[in-house]
């Protein structure tokens, strides 16, 4: 089925078998007028009578129109000529009636009609939805004919009905085009980062981020998955372990050992045991999932009871009133008031449960819109993903990995035992060696297997808890260090001593997240026990007896439980007993080294992080941009950095605790991880702020800021600490361009700024200027002059964010936003909300720099007095700088407030010199205290000598800008 035959069937173009060419041409024109997304050039050339041999011969190539090997420019003329020729009559096409009728309906993105958004696969010319695919490729070919010089991007962007047109570019085609065409920084929504040689990443905007060692728990789920691949590659290339290394699989089904088979047979015989084991003898990931599910069930029951009691308490006042009012009424009214509390207190009715808690049945893909109280539900759903993927035999690549740090995957039993022993057993001599009560240990095991929330108190024996922990590790189907890496861990002893620790670190990176987190918790506990092995003196001067459990003794006990091979039979074990003894010695040495160096083993050095980012940059550059910006924002705030370190090293260990210290944001990928902390809302609002093609974020103080690549010259920039201001008040600061007007003499280290102050165009000079979001007054200024002076391109204040070499000679125009009324005299006036005034913010990118600069420059020339206009390429020295606040410039601000500069007449008569006053007022608004906080703007400086003059000028401004003045602009033009 050729593409040209589709055009014939759809548009009913003229053919040799048609009755008359004129009628067919008119019919095709009438049909094309009903389509809102086709180029008008089609109407004139659709019914021309030319030879159809060439068109039919080349119509078969329409399916390969935008293939990567054929440029659009070379295909344009050929396909244009083929579109004008009448195609041969198709014999296998369906009737053209339904297709033509579908063109008359309005096209929307949800519709599947040919005139709507085309959902097609460009690699397959025919197949499912083949009509839409062929036609979607044919129509751009016709459009490419008249203008063969246009590129594919211009064709897709031109002559279409906006987002609902037929030229909505498919995602996969754009991904291929991204690698074919040279990168355009303005076209990509994410910043392009480049890796330097010293683990430093530089962005297109000039920001530089240096990587540092971080705990492995602080990495996102996607980073940890890529870290496995990077570690696997380095082990194969750099480490000679003389064995085959494979990445362990999470949740694999293992063959049952003889002991497990006997245990399962015994459980089948004992039918009185109605519970399914929840902890012992199960894969580690399943144990964690069971813990999460049980914790979720408990929380839901507790919340339902709380909601039911709250519901009853809320209804009791109404019930009491109605009962007191209707004591003499019928029994039916009394019964109706008593039925509601009885129904609400019933635990079986789900009505008291709020709507949000009944959202557990939703798909995992849409769990990002749950609130903060659903973090445990998120974790339970996320933990159930590996089991579901394994049961459905899905590929690991198909799983959606989060860009946020996942919570600690440590079983509740392991964490409870470690906490109990750290609290009560550090001074117990011979811990893990002294025998325990088998009966009490069996009882504790059954309680954990039933899923009961066991609370280990002081009355529980330390030796019983220690035996329970060893039994849990011994009964795991797969050891904690996995059987795939058994030989690799042992062969690390064959390496040089300086290489052993690095190889162990890479092998730990290969472990699944649940094994890695549990191993970290266990090694941390064993390290604490080993530190209390020797006798020491307490703070009170008393001698404290050590537990005598050194790292070697602990490795001797836990080594065979952490790393062992599967024993198929007792006979095989007896034959290989001598070899097992040698391997046991090696296992003990490996575990001892891990206990002594556990802190360094779970830190990710910068070189591995750099490899992970390079690996991600090849496939997902937007993810690299997201991760690097988050690293910069984390390091910029010390409190977030401390909380991240405390989360990674200590604090929450159990799988029942939420990852409240997670600092990830809403990622470009679907996010399955727990709900993040409240601090991440700041960065999320920065993501949502419309700032052009490149989003600029907070840069930490310790990171070096280099000059912007697009600037003609490099200047200093010193970002200050971020103010603790909520970004919900103003998502961006539009007055950052003020800093380009600062001179070298006004430098002051007291500048404070926010994320929106660093623009791509302006390298900021340090000054005592406060750039928080709170410095914008709630009202816009009312511009003086007639409405004709403000053309359509300059409504209010225009924000430009790019810089060109043309702006080198002169500073940015002083666009200010001042308070139109002093707060002292605005008591009875209705203030316009800030949201309304924000409608007049016009954001211009780098491509409209010249137009916006001309507009604002013209506005400045009209509003500035003649003596203060810039001459040539420089600024007149008589023009004083705007009065920036700060401890370093009170004298300059006071001097500018007390008197105007030379050459400017001070208006005294309001009626006689109205024009000059208007110019001065507008100039003052352009260069006045726009960067002053609202408190400093409106508070009169009683200590200044010119306070009365300043107050009089403020009143004149207010009177001039009031609504009673006919010269003021209308409300809608401000």
From Swiss-Prot:
Stored InterPro entries: ARHGAP6_RhoGAP (IPR041852), Rho_GTPase_activation_prot (IPR008936), RHOGAP6/36 (IPR037863), RhoGAP_dom (IPR000198)
GO molecular function: GTPase activator activity; phospholipase activator activity; phospholipase binding; SH3 domain binding
Comp. bias intervals (Low complexity): 12-24, 326-348, 889-901
Protein's UniProt keywords contain Amino-acid biosynthesis: no
Pro residues bias (residue ranges): 85-98
Motif residue range(s): SH3-binding: 342-352
Superkingdom: Eukaryota
Keywords of the record: Cytoplasm, GTPase activation, Phosphoprotein, SH3-binding
Keyword match Cytoplasm: yes
Entries under Pfam families matching the protein: RhoGAP
Domain annotation Rho-GAP: ranges: 401-602
GO CC annotation terms, alphabetical: actin cytoskeleton; actin filament; cytoplasm; cytosol; mitotic spindle
Record site feature (Arginine finger), residues: 433
Modified residue annotations for Phosphoserine: 37, 264, 363, 667, 673, 680, 711, 754, 772, 777, 786, 820, 928, 931, 939
Signal sequence segment: none
Tissue specificity: Highly expressed in kidney, heart and skeletal muscle followed by retina, lymphoblast, placenta, lung, brain, pancreas and liver.
Subcellular location: Cytoplasm
Disordered, as annotated region: 1-120, 322-361, 639-672, 709-729, 742-838, 860-945
BP GO annotations: actin filament organization; actin filament polymerization; focal adhesion assembly; negative regulation of focal adhesion assembly; negative regulation of stress fiber assembly; positive regulation of intracellular signal transduction; positive regulation of phospholipase C/protein kinase C signal transduction; regulation of small GTPase mediated signal transduction
Bias type Polar residues, positions: 101-116, 656-672, 752-778, 920-931
Physiological role: GTPase activator for the Rho-type GTPases by converting them to an inactive GDP-bound state. Could regulate the interactions of signaling molecules with the actin cytoskeleton. Promotes continuous elongation of cytoplasmic processes during cell motility and simultaneous retraction of the cell body changing the cell morphology.
Further information: ARHGAP6 gene undergoes X inactivation.
Stated name of the protein: Rho GTPase-activating protein 6
């Amino acid at each position: 089925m050729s593409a040209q035959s589709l055009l014939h069937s759809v548009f009913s173009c003229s053919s040799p078998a048609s009755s008359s060419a004129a009628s067919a041409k008119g019919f095709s024109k009438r049909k094309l007028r009903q389509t809102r997304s086709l180029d008008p050039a089609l109407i004139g050339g659709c019914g021309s009578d030319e030879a159809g041999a060439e068109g039919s011969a080349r119509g078969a190539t329409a399916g390969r129109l935008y293939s990567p090997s054929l440029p659009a420019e070379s295909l344009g003329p050929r396909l244009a000529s083929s579109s004008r020729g009448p195609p041969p009559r198709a014999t296998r096409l369906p009737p053209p009636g339904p297709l033509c009728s579908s063109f008359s309906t309005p096209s929307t993105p949800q519709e599947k009609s040919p005139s709507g958004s085309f959902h097609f696969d460009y690699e397959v010319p025919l197949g499912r939805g083949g009509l839409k695919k062929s036609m979607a490729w044919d129509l751009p070919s016709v459009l490419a004919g008249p203008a063969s010089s246009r590129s594919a991007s211009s064709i897709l962007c031109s002559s279409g009905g906006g987002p609902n047109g037929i030229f909505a570019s498919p995602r996969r085609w754009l991904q291929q085009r991204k690698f074919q065409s040279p990168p355009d920084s303005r076209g990509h929504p994410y910043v392009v980062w480049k890796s330097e040689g010293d683990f430093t990443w530089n962005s297109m905007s000039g920001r530089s981020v240096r990587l540092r060692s971080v705990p492995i728990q602080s990495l996102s789920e996607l980073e940890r998955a890529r870290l496995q691949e990077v570690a696997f590659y380095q082990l194969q290339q750099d480490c000679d372990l003389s064995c085959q290394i494979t990445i362990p699989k999470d949740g694999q089904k293992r063959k049952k050992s003889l002991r497990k088979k006997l245990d399962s047979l015994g459980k089948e015989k004992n039918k009185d045991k109605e519970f399914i084991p929840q902890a012992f003898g199960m894969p580690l990931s399943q144990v964690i999932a069971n813990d999460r599910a049980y914790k979720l069930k408990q929380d839901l029951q507790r919340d339902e009871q709380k909601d039911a009691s709250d519901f009853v308490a809320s209804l009791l006042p109404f019930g009491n009133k109605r009962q007191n009012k209707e004591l003499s009424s019928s029994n039916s009214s009394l019964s109706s008031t008593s039925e509601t509390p009885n129904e609400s207190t019933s635990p079986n009715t789900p009505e008291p449960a709020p709507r949000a808690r009944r959202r557990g049945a939703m798909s995992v893909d849409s769990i990002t819109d749950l609130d903060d109280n659903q973090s445990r539900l998120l974790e339970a759903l996320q933990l159930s993903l590996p089991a579901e993927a394994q049961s459905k035999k899905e590929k690991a690549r198909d799983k959606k990995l989060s860009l946020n740090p996942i919570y600690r995957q440590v079983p509740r039993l392991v964490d409870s035992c470690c906490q109990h022993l750290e609290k009560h057993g550090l001074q117990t001599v011979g811990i893990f060696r002294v025998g325990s009560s088998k009966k009490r240990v069996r009882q504790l095991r059954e309680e954990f297997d039933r899923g009961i929330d066991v609370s280990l108190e002081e009355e529980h024996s330390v030796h019983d808890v220690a035996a329970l922990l060893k039994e849990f590790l011994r009964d795991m189907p797969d050891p904690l260090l996995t059987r795939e890496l058994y030989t690799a861990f042992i062969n690390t002893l064959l390496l040089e001593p300086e290489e052993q620790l690095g190889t162990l670190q890479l092998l730990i990176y290969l472990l699944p997240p649940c094994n890695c987190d549990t191993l970290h918790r266990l090694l941390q506990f064993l390290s604490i026990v080993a530190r209390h092995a020797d006798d020491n003196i307490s703070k009170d001067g008393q001698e404290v007896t050590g537990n005598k459990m050194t790292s070697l003794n602990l490795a001797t006990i836990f080594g065979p439980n952490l790393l062992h091979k599967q024993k198929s039979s007792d006979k095989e074990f007896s034959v290989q007993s001598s070899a097992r003894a040698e391997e046991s010695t090696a296992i003990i040495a490996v575990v001892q080294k891990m206990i002594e160096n556990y802190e360094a083993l779970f830190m990710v050095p910068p070189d591995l992080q750099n490899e992970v980012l390079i690996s991600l940059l090849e496939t997902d550059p937007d993810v690299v941009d997201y991760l690097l910006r988050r690293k910069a924002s984390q390091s910029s705030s010390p409190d977030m950095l401390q909380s991240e370190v405390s989360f990674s090293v200590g604090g929450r260990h159990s799988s029942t605790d939420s990852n409240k210290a997670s600092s990830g944001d809403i990622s470009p990928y679907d996010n399955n991880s727990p709900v993040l902390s409240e601090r991440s809302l700041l960065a999320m609002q920065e993501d949502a702020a419309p700032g052009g093609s490149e989003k600029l974020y907070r840069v930490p103080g310790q990171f070096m800021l280099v000059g912007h690549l697009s600037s003609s010259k490099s200047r200093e920039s010193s970002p200050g600490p971020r103010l603790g201001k909520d970004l919900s008040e103003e998502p961006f600061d539009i007055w950052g361009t003020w800093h380009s007007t600062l001179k070298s003499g006004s430098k002051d280290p007291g500048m404070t700024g926010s994320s929106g102050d660093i623009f791509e165009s302006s390298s900021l000079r340090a000054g005592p200027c406060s750039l928080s979001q709170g410095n914008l007054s709630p009202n816009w200024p009312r511009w003086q002059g007639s409405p004709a002076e403000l053309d359509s391109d300059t409504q209010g204040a225009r924000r430009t964010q790019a810089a060109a070499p043309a702006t080198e000679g002169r500073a940015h125009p002083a666009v200010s936003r001042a308070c139109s009324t002093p707060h002292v005299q605005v008591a009875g006036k209705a203030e316009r909300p800030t949201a309304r005034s924000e409608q007049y913010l016009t954001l211009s990118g780098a491509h409209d720099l010249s137009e916006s600069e001309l507009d604002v420059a013209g506005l400045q020339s009209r509003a500035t007095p003649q003596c203060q206009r810039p001459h040539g390429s420089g600024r007149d020295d008589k023009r004083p700088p705007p009065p920036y606040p700060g401890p370093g410039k009170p004298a300059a601000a006071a001097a500018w407030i007390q008197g105007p500069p030379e050459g400017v007449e001070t208006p005294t008569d309001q009626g006689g010199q109205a024009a000059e006053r208007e110019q001065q007022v507008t100039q003052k608004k352009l260069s006045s205290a726009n960067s002053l906080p609202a408190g400093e703007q409106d508070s009169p400086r009683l200590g200044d000598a010119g306070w009365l003059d300043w107050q009089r000028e403020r009143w004149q401004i207010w009177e001039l800008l009031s609504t009673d003045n006919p010269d003021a602009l209308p409300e809608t033009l401000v």
